[in-house]
């Protein structure tokens, strides 16, 4: 009897399979544009109980001058100090009452204000964000109090040697240009920025055509569009509006091969970053450069079995105790970038060897990258990119950043296909184009007396393998 039941069940399953269809249940990004140019983008998950909504603005420290450097970051601090409708206390209380998290950050090319809340409270979150963006009081007393807060933040940043090195790397790579400035700005600017500077930055940069309102998780696209029309329709438009992702007539930054060395023999380690000019977000070489960066990857001597990792550079450095750690990077901006490596070492007498073998591996990419390491790098890159899209806030970050920088959003499947399309020949091509015999920017901090001069390091950028 039991056998007949099992056979009947099997026949039933076979019947079901013959009628099965494949359905793409994955979320997709809906994009609309208001009459004033503000973009609304959503990736809805109807059954989600929480949502992230935020505004991504195509303006950061790059939109400042030498005199106003630090204004965008200062504004980020002032956003939570009260508006015409809400005092600081009322704003904080309203956010707490709905159990939301309100946050903001500034980068060199973007400013972001976002909130994570329950789905039912999305209208309140959008109202709060629109209020702080358009109606912040910018009171003189609050500005004066915030100076001390930002100066303390600057002191904390100065203690993070990686941050210090990368700020110097930008400063030498893009000398005298907006991308070379720090995000917080110099101390003198922090002490001198006035309300008029903040108001002028808002008027110039907080315009509808430079903003993307993003919603992810438990949000409905049409509902968010209506909220955008209600709260953002009065936003002005730039004097010379451009579609998001379109480069302005501003001249592309000039990459300068140069260096900055800050020697401090009291430190037990040397911190060195070296980079060539990279590519912008929309460059056709973006994904090949990302794969090449993934070939080198990251390494730390605390990792177990580090000498057995697939990266040849990891094996060389770990086997010879040349460094404590290294981190490869491919940093992109709208029209340029930095591609390189950041090393930390207490083997101070062998800094020359550390850089020599690193650049030797860079050189090898122009001549003989292997199929195996390229395929491994592609798998690692895909895993890293796709696994980073975990949670509504991470997805909102991805959507906002992509639309602001390129005017569109690549789906995870499209990203996967773009990475898969990278070949060994592509790696050779981009290595020859961006690495071989190119000038580099170098920033070094700490106990760096053993670091050889720029000219000798430069020779390794085109040395033969043998």
Curated annotation (Swiss-Prot):
Record's GO cellular component terms: mitochondrial matrix
Active site: 76 (proton acceptor)
SUPFAM superfamilies xrefs: LuxS/MPP-like metallohydrolase
Principal EC category: hydrolase
EC number annotated for this UniProt entry: 3.4.24.64
Major location (coarse): mitochondrion
Quaternary context: Heterodimer of mppA (alpha) and mppB (beta) subunits, forming the mitochondrial processing protease (MPP) in which mppA is involved in substrate recognition and binding and mppB is the catalytic subunit.
UniProt name for this protein: Mitochondrial-processing peptidase subunit beta
High-level lineage: Eukaryota, Fungi, Dikarya, Basidiomycota, Agaricomycotina
């Amino acid at each position: 009897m039991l056998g007949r039941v099992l056979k009947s069940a099997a026949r039933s399953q076979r019947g079901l399979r013959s009628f099965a269809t494949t359905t793409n249940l994955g979320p997709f990004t809906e994009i609309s544009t208001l009459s004033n140019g503000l973009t609304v983008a959503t990736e809805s998950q109807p059954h989600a109980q929480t949502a992230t909504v935020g505004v991504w603005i195509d303006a950061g420290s790059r939109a400042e001058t030498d005199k106003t450097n630090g204004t965008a970051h200062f504004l980020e601090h002032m956003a939570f100090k009260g508006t015409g409708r809400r005092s600081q206390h009322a704003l904080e209380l309203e956010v707490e009452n709905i159990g939301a998290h309100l946050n903001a950050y500034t980068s060199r090319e973007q400013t972001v204000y976002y909130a994570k809340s329950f789905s039912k409270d999305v209208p309140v979150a959008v109202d709060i964000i629109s209020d702080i963006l358009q109606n912040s009081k910018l009171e003189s007393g609050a500005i004066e109090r915030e100076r001390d807060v930002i100066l303390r933040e600057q002191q904390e940043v100065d203690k993070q040697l990686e941050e210090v090195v990368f700020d110097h790397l930008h400063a030498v790579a893009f000398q005298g240009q907006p991308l070379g400035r720090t995000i917080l700005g110099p101390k003198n600017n922090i002490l001198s920025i006035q309300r008029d500077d903040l108001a002028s930055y808002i008027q110039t940069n907080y315009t509808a055509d430079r903003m993307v309102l993003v919603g992810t998780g438990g949000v409905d696209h049409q509902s968010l569009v209506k909220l955008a029309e209600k709260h953002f329709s009065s936003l002005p438009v730039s004097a010379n509006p451009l579609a998001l992702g379109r480069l302005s007539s501003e001249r592309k930054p000039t990459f300068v091969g140069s260096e900055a060395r800050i020697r401090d023999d009291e430190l037990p380690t040397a911190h060195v970053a070296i980079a060539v000019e990279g590519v912008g977000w929309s460059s056709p070489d973006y994904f090949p450069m990302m794969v090449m960066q993934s070939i080198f990857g990251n390494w730390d001597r605390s990792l177990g079995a580090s000498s057995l990792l697939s990266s040849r550079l990891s094996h060389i450095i770990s086997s010879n105790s040349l460094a404590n750690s290294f981190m490869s990077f491919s940093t992109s901006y709208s029209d340029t970038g930095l591609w390189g490596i950041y090393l930390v070492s207490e083997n101070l007498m062998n800094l020359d060897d550390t850089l020599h073998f690193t650049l030797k591996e860079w050189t090898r990419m122009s001549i003989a990258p292997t199929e195996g390491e390229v395929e491994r790098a592609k798998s690692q890159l895909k895993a890293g990119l796709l696994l980073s899209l975990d949670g509504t806030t991470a997805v909102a970050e991805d959507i906002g950043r992509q639309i602001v920088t390129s005017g569109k959003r690549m789906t995870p499947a499209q990203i996967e296909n773009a990475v898969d399309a990278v070949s060994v020949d592509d790696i050779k091509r981009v290595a020859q184009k961006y690495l071989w015999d190119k000038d580099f920017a170098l920033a070094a901090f700490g106990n760096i007396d053993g670091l050889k001069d720029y000219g000798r390091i430069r020779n390794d950028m085109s040395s033969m393998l043998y």
